[in-house]
C-alpha cells in the first residue's frame, strides 16, 4: 500500500513538472509545483492570474509648479521671516498648504506670464489661464481616482469650454492667442468639419417631401383658379343669368 501511494505521488509530481506553459500568466511563465504555489502568498497569485499587477505611470508635476519650500503669500513680506525656525517655515510653506492655496499660487504665476494686468480676470486670456489650472488639477485627480465619473465629466466640460474660448481669442486677437498657447504649453486643434453621410432613407425622405410640396402647390393653384372662375361667373351671371353648374364646368375646362 505504501509503495502504491508513493508511486502515485511521484507520477503526480512528474506530470506537474512536464506541464505545458499556462497562457493566462503574464510573460508566458510555466506552472510550478503545487508546493511552490502554496509557499507564495495568495495576493500575488491572484494578481498574476487576474492581471492586476500592471501599474499605470503616475503623472509628473508640471514644470511651472512652484517649489514646495516656497512660503505662502501672506508670510512672504513679514519682517524677520528668515530667522524663523525651519519647522515653522515648513508649516507656512507650500508643502503643508491645502489644494486651494496651491491652485491660487499657480494661477497667479501663470497670470503674470500671460496677462499684462494680473488683476484682470474678465478677459479671454485670463479665463483661459483659470481653466487651464483647473484642468490640470482635474487631470492629477483622475490619475489617482480613475473611476471618478463626476470629475471626469467636469474635466471634459472644462476642456470644451477652453477650446471655445481659444477659438474666440484666435478670431479677435491672434498675437495674444499665440502667446497664451506658448506660455501655457497647450495646442489648439481645429474642430472637424460637419459631414452627414447620405443614405437611401434620407434621399427617399427628401424626394417625398419635394413631391408633397409640388402636390400642395398644384392644389392651391387649382383652388385659386376655381375662385377666380367663380368670381368671373358671378359677374357674368349678374349680366346674363345662367345656372352656376354650367359656369363652373366652363371654368374647369378653361383651366385644363
From Swiss-Prot:
GO molecular function: structural constituent of ribosome
Transit peptide boundaries: 1-53
Name of this chain's protein: Small ribosomal subunit protein uS15m
Listed InterPro entries: Ribosomal_uS15, Ribosomal_uS15_bac-type, uS15_NS1_RNA-bd_sf, uS15_ribosomal
Comp. bias regions, Low complexity: 227-239
SUPFAM superfamilies: S15/NS1 RNA-binding domain
This protein's UniProt keywords: Mitochondrion, Ribonucleoprotein, Ribosomal protein, Transit peptide
GO biological process: mitochondrial translation
Cross-referenced CDD domains: Ribosomal_S15p_S13e
Annotated segments matching region Disordered: 226-256
Major subcellular location class: mitochondrion
Quaternary structure note: Component of the mitochondrial ribosome small subunit (28S) which comprises a 12S rRNA and about 30 distinct proteins. Interacts with METTL17.
GO CC annotation terms, alphabetical: mitochondrial inner membrane; mitochondrial small ribosomal subunit
Gene name, Swiss-Prot/TrEMBL: MRPS15
Family in the record: Belongs to the universal ribosomal protein uS15 family.
Amino acid at each position: 500500500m505504501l509503495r502504491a501511494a508513493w508511486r502515485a505521488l511521484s507520477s503526480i509530481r512528474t506530470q506537474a513538472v512536464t506541464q505545458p506553459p499556462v497562457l493566462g500568466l503574464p510573460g508566458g511563465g510555466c506552472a510550478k509545483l503545487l508546493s511552490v504555489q502554496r509557499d507564495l502568498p495568495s495576493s500575488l497569485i491572484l494578481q498574476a492570474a487576474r492581471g492586476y499587477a500592471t501599474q499605470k505611470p503616475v503623472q509628473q508635476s508640471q514644470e511651472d509648479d512652484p517649489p514646495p519650500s516656497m512660503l505662502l503669500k501672506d508670510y512672504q513680506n513679514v519682517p524677520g521671516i528668515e530667522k524663523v525656525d525651519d519647522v515653522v517655515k515648513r508649516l507656512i510653506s507650500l508643502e503643508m498648504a491645502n489644494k486651494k492655496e496651491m491652485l491660487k499660487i499657480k494661477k497667479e504665476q501663470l497670470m503674470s506670464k500671460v496677462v499684462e494686468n494680473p488683476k484682470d480676470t474678465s478677459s479671454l486670456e485670463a479665463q483661459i489661464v483659470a481653466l487651464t489650472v483647473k484642468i490640470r488639477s482635474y487631470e492629477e485627480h483622475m490619475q489617482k481616482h480613475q473611476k471618478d465619473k463626476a470629475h471626469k465629466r467636469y474635466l471634459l466640460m472644462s476642456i470644451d469650454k477652453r477650446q471655445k474660448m481659444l477659438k474666440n481669442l484666435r478670431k479677435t486677437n491672434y498675437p495674444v492667442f499665440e502667446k497664451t498657447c506658448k506660455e501655457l504649453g497647450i495646442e489648439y486643434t481645429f474642430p472637424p468639419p460637419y459631414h452627414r453621410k447620405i443614405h437611401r432613407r434620407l434621399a427617399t425622405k427628401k424626394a417625398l417631401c419635394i413631391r408633397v410640396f409640388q402636390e400642395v402647390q398644384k392644389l392651391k393653384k387649382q383652388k385659386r383658379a376655381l375662385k377666380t372662375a367663380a368670381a368671373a361667373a358671378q359677374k357674368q351671371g349678374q349680366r346674363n343669368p345662367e345656372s352656376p353648374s354650367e359656369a363652373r364646368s366652363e371654368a374647369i375646362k378653361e383651366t385644363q
